[in-house]
Regions:
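Active-site-adjacent loop/helix surface patches within enzyme catalytic domains
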Residues: 24-45, 50-153
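Non-catalytic cell-wall polysaccharide-engagement segments
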Residues: 1-22
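N-terminal pre-domains immediately preceding structured catalytic cores
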Residues: 20-46, 179-202
C-alpha cells in the first residue's frame, strides 16, 4: 500500500493547508452591508468524535476490505479495520471524516460521518465474531472512550443509524458483552413477577 499511503499523505497536507488559510473576504453587492473582518481567536482546538459506529465488512477477507478501502472508485472507508486474527489496521486519522455511515440518522444527527469513528470487523455478515477480534475491539473502544470522552450510549451499530438498509454488525454480535464493558446499552433482563392479586383495572 505504498502508493495509497502516498496519496493519503498528499490529501492530509491539502486539507491542513485549507484549514490553515484565512477565510477569503466575500464582497457584498449591497453596499449597506459591512464586509466581514477576520479576527483570529486564540482559543480553539480540534473537534472530537462523539460516536463510534461498528460495522461488519460483508467481505471474504481482511485483505479484500483493505483493497476496497484504498480504491478511489469505491468511495467507502473506515477509521479502523479489525481482522479475525485480532490484527488492527488504522486507516484514517480519528479527526478526519471517513465514509462509512452513508445515509442515516441517530437522534438529531443526520451527518453521522462528521461526528463518528467507523470500525469495520472482518466478517462475511453471517458468521460469529472471533474472540481475538473481540479482544482487539474492546481494547480499541476503551482507548477511544477515554481519549475522546465518548458517552456509553454513543457506541452503536450501522444498523442503528440506517435500520431500513443495513443490519450490521450481524445478529451474532455480542452487544451484551460490550454493554457490560461500558460500550453501548443493553436492556434490563431482571423482570419482577406480577403479583397474583394484581388488579389491572385500577
Amino acid at each position: 500500500y505504498t502508493s495509497t499511503n502516498k496519496v493519503y499523505k498528499q490529501k492530509v497536507k491539502a486539507y491542513a493547508k485549507e484549514i490553515a488559510a484565512l477565510p477569503k473576504e466575500i464582497p457584498f453587492s449591497d453596499s449597506a452591508l459591512l464586509p466581514p473582518y477576520w479576527v483570529g481567536t486564540t482559543n480553539f482546538n480540534l473537534r472530537k468524535p462523539t460516536f463510534v459506529i461498528i460495522h461488519h465488512t460483508a467481505q471474504n477477507s481482511c485483505d479484500q476490505t483493505l483493497k476496497t478501502f484504498t480504491l478511489p472508485r469505491t468511495s467507502v472507508s473506515a477509521h479502523y479495520v479489525i481482522c479475525k486474527s485480532g490484527v488492527l489496521h488504522h486507516m484514517l486519522n480519528d479527526y478526519l471524516r471517513a465514509w462509512h455511515g452513508g445515509v442515516g440518522k441517530w437522534g438529531n444527527q443526520t451527518d453521522i460521518n462528521s461526528v463518528s469513528i467507523g470500525i469495520e470487523l472482518d466478517n462475511n455478515g453471517f458468521e460469529p465474531f472471533d474472540s481475538l477480534q473481540m479482544n482487539s475491539l474492546l481494547s480499541l473502544l476503551d482507548r477511544l472512550k477515554k481519549q475522546y470522552a465518548i458517552p456509553t450510549a454513543n457506541f452503536i451499530g450501522h444498523g442503528d443509524i440506517a435500520p431500513t438498509r443495513k443490519n450490521d454488525p450481524n445478529y451474532r454480535f455480542p452487544w451484551k458483552l460490550l454493554a457490560e464493558k461500558g460500550f453501548g446499552l443493553w436492556y434490563d433482563e431482571n423482570r419482577e413477577a406480577v403479583p397474583a392479586d394484581f388488579n389491572h383495572i385500577q
